[in-house]
């Protein structure tokens, strides 16, 4: 008890341990409330991948959740790590089985599984006379971001066990050629196959890299467990990705602005003028096109240097190797080139403006021509989808890529998957017909 007039006694401060405990309890309570809120609102931002010592990464068996980065679809990975329904590895006698290899277009997490082109293909091929009453299965081995080299490794590691009658490779022309080359892909956490003389040599140096070693560590495994079981980690990851995407968009706008300024400066230096009064699109100099520096768009130009020529040679060798391994097991091998957004943008004027920015020699179907030439040289069956998909989009005035707010960009939407699946089924049905009625091997359709 204090004496009258004396200063009040100060209460002792809580110890540091107590203060830390209070802060920790407050944080945990806030996270608990946040977790409950996210679960009640059914928020999720799932990750579907895990590291793999052969392929770099694969889909995580059993992973599932809503994918909302592009489009909206509930994605479930089956028990064998495929974005597909459950499949039996042993092939029944009455089944015609197609194994699909590809990247994000084949994985198709942007749409419901039943709307994906491979599901459309499966249904339509079932009506094909060449199926001869057999039940058709199109099994999807596609994984987002895979290079052709990773797809060849997938063929060796995973596809063979399913005993397919046909192996179908879907090529995304605006990045598959470059994804096989480390200097272009700029990724050190995946395997590569490199040309060595007339063959391919593995480059598995990614296994010794810090990034892959961390992903396979106990700490990373614990992190994946937390991510699989706690929704608030999804919210933090989404915020991180949104922040990175906005930074990338700002950088892209800055690069485009700088390229346009260089183009205008070059035009002034050459005695050029501003845009013609009639509104016609000015024709830039070859090195001044704003899109020329975009790696994905360089595929529409003739290979400009040894790096690009080497990338095309490697792609050809990978396809030949894949065909040889498939046919050695008694199956047939088909290649299909899909479509890039600008190729099927339903506005000829927009496509023409894009080509003008790229400069002289640009050809929207240049990649298809080069793949067709590969087919003719090597006896590969190549289906070129983009030209007919462009005609389809123009005739119907429909976007095959993108969703409201970003129509014409990104991956195939439901319209694109449906059109591609139906077109591919038609082309494959013709090729699967008895040999007397089929087009000769090594052609393109």
Named regions from a protein language model:
Residues 14, 115, 172-380, 385-395:
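Serine-dependent acyl-ester chemistry module
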Residues 33, 404-445:
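Histidine-centered active-site loop/cap adjacent to the catalytic His
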Residues 1-97, 112, 161-165, 178-181, ...:
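N-terminal secretory targeting modules
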Residues 118, 122, 152-156, 316-319, ...:
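Extracytoplasmic/secreted envelope proteins and their assembly/folding machinery
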Residues 41-132, 252-297, 369-371, 389-407:
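Membrane/wall-proximal cationic-aromatic binding patches
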């Amino acid at each position: 008890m204090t004496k009258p007039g004396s200063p009040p006694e100060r209460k002792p401060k809580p110890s540091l341990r107590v203060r830390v405990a209070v802060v920790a309890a407050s944080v945990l309570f806030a996270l608990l409330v946040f977790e409950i809120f996210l679960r009640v609102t059914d928020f999720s931002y799932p990750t579907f991948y895990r590291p793999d010592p052969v392929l770099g990464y694969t889909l995580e068996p059993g992973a599932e959740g809503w994918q909302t980065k592009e489009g909206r679809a509930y994605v479930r990975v089956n028990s064998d790590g495929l974005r597909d329904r459950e499949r039996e590895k042993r092939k029944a006698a009455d089944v015609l089985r197609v194994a699909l290899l590809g990247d994000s277009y084949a994985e198709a997490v942007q749409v419901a599984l039943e709307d994906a082109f491979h599901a459309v293909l499966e249904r339509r091929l079932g009506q094909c006379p060449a199926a001869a009453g057999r039940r058709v299965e199109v099994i999807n081995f596609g994984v987002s971001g895979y290079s052709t080299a990773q797809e060849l490794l997938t063929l060796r590691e995973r596809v063979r066990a399913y005993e397919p009658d046909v192996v179908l490779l879907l090529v995304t022309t605006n990045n598959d050629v470059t994804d096989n080359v480390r200097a272009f892909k700029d990724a050190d956490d995946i395997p590569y196959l490199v040309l060595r003389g007339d063959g391919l040599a593995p480059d598995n140096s990614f296994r010794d890299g810090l990034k892959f070693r961390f992903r396979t560590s106990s700490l990373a495994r614990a992190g994946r467990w937390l991510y699989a079981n706690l929704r608030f980690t999804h919210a933090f990851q989404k915020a991180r990705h949104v922040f990175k995407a906005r930074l990338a968009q700002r950088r892209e706008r800055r690069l485009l602005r700088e390229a346009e300024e260089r183009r205008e400066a070059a035009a002034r230096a050459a005695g050029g003028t501003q845009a013609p009064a009639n509104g016609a699109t000015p024709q830039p100099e070859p090195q001044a096109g704003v899109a020329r520096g975009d790696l994905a768009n360089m595929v529409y130009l003739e290979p400009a240097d040894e790096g690009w020529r080497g990338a095309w040679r490697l792609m050809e060798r990978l396809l030949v190797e894949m065909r040889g391994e498939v046919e050695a097991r008694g199956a047939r091998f088909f290649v299909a080139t899909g479509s890039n957004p600008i190729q099927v943008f339903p506005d000829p004027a927009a496509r023409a403006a894009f080509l003008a920015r790229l400069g002289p020699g640009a050809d929207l179907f240049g990649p298809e021509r080069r793949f067709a030439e590969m087919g003719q040289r090597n006896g590969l069956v190549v289906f070129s989808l983009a030209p007919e998909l462009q005609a389809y989009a123009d005739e119907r005035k429909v976007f095959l890529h993108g969703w409201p707010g970003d129509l014409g960009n990104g991956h195939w939407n439901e319209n694109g998957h449906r059109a591609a699946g139906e077109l591919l089924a038609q082309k494959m049905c013709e090729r699967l017909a008895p040999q007397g009625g089929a087009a000769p091997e090594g052609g393109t359709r």
